Amino acid sequence: MNWDLPLTVTIDGKEHEIDNGCDYRVVLNCIGFYEDTSLDLQTQHQAAFMTFYKDPLSITNANEAIKQMLLIIDCKTEAEFEQNSAEQNQNSPRLMNWTKDFKFIAPAVSRILGYDVRTPGRCTHWWTFLGAWQEIGECFWSTIISIRNKMAKGQKLEEWERKIYRERKKDIDLPINITDEEKEWLNSDW
C-alpha cells in the first residue's frame, strides 16, 4: 500500500507525471471540462487528459490514462471506482458546480488548511484540497449546499434560509444545462 500523495500514475508499466504535482487547480481545470455541457464526452476526456498529464503525448494508452486520471480525481482505488460506476445513481440531485462555486469553496478550504489555497505558486495537492473540503463545517458554503439540497428534494426552507435565498439567488441557483439543440428550439418561433 502506498501512503503518499500520488504524483504519478503507472500506465502499461511506465510512470507518467501528473502536471504541477497534482495541484488542485489542474484537477479543477479537468473537472471544468466535464462540467461544460457544450462538449461531448470524448472531447471532455481529451481536454482533461491533455491538461492532467505533464507530458500527455508520451502516453500510448489513452483509455488507461483517462481511467487512472479519473481514479485520482475521484480519490478512489480501482475496485471502489468500478463499484461506484456500477452503483452510481444518475437521478441524485446535483448540488454543486466546482467552477461556479469555487469562490465559496476556496475560503472554506483555506480556513481548514490554515493558508490561502489561492496563493500563486503555492501547490496544494488535489487530495489535500479534497480532504479539507470534506471537513468544512458551518459556513456560507455549507448553507448554500443545504439550501440546494432542500430545494432539490422539494423540502420547505426555514425562514432564514428563504431570506438568504432571496438575497443570494444568483449564487445559490446552479446553471441549467441544456443542449445546443434545446437552445435552438427555445430561440425558435415554435
How should these model regions be labeled?
Residues 1, 59-60, 157:
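Short, charge-rich amphipathic segments
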Residues 9, 16-18, 48, 69-72, ...:
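Generic structural hydrophobic/aromatic packing signal, biased to beta-strands
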Residues 37-39, 46-51, 56-90:
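A broadly used, surface-exposed interaction patch
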